[in-house]
């Protein structure tokens, strides 16, 4: 894979933040695709990784856990040293630079204004077929208390929208999705992350 940051041959090593959320589902898909999944709970677990997935869950709770465990600063450092990051649902919230709601811990690694629970609470969870930039057919998105980006800054590439609301985006080495690809049988977003984001030398 071109652009491998740690220079090792063979399987890319991709961490999955295992503080909360669907980390096991992500790990199973990574394994099927030939990557080496690594559960990440402490800053030292980031060593030697090509990428990191921040799964869904409750973004404020995950953010507070990240602060108390030292993971917030560690993930920022990992990213700014060339590591790839993919945030799904709550991970999308955490990746943003600002939120429309109450203050909460954010990584600030993508220039975007996020609306938490933008599509409503759990009772309003839904599925939708998405037209995704670069995909040859629609992707079935599973939305659970999903956020969306109300606005994005320069350098952020919008990959998918619903009624003008940004639900997938990329900026260099960071990818975000408001939905849960790990809860479907469609592995295209995981393949995209491994190939295009982990394997890229591009910075945000």
UniProtKB/Swiss-Prot annotation:
Record-level GO BP terms: glutamine catabolic process; pyridoxal phosphate biosynthetic process; pyridoxine metabolic process
InterPro entries in the cross-refs: Class_I_gatase-like (IPR029062), PdxT/SNO (IPR002161), PdxT/SNO_CS (IPR021196)
Assigned keywords, A-Z: Glutamine amidotransferase, Hydrolase, Lyase, Pyridoxal phosphate
Active-site residues from the entry: 89 (nucleophile), 180 (charge relay system), 182 (charge relay system)
A GO cellular component entry from the record: cytosol
EC number: 4.3.3.6, 3.5.1.2
Pathway: Cofactor biosynthesis; pyridoxal 5'-phosphate biosynthesis
PANTHER family: PYRIDOXAL 5'-PHOSPHATE SYNTHASE SUBUNIT SNO, PYRIDOXAL 5'-PHOSPHATE SYNTHASE SUBUNIT SNO1-RELATED
HAMAP family from the UniProt entry: PdxT (MF_01615)
Role summary: Catalyzes the hydrolysis of glutamine to glutamate and ammonia as part of the biosynthesis of pyridoxal 5'-phosphate. The resulting ammonia molecule is channeled to the active site of PdxS.
Family: Belongs to the glutaminase PdxT/SNO family.
UniProt protein name: Pyridoxal 5'-phosphate synthase subunit PdxT
Taxonomic source organism: Rubrobacter xylanophilus (strain DSM 9941 / JCM 11954 / NBRC 16129 / PRD-1)
Lineage, broadest ranks: Bacteria, Bacillati, Actinomycetota, Rubrobacteria, Rubrobacterales
Gene label: pdxT
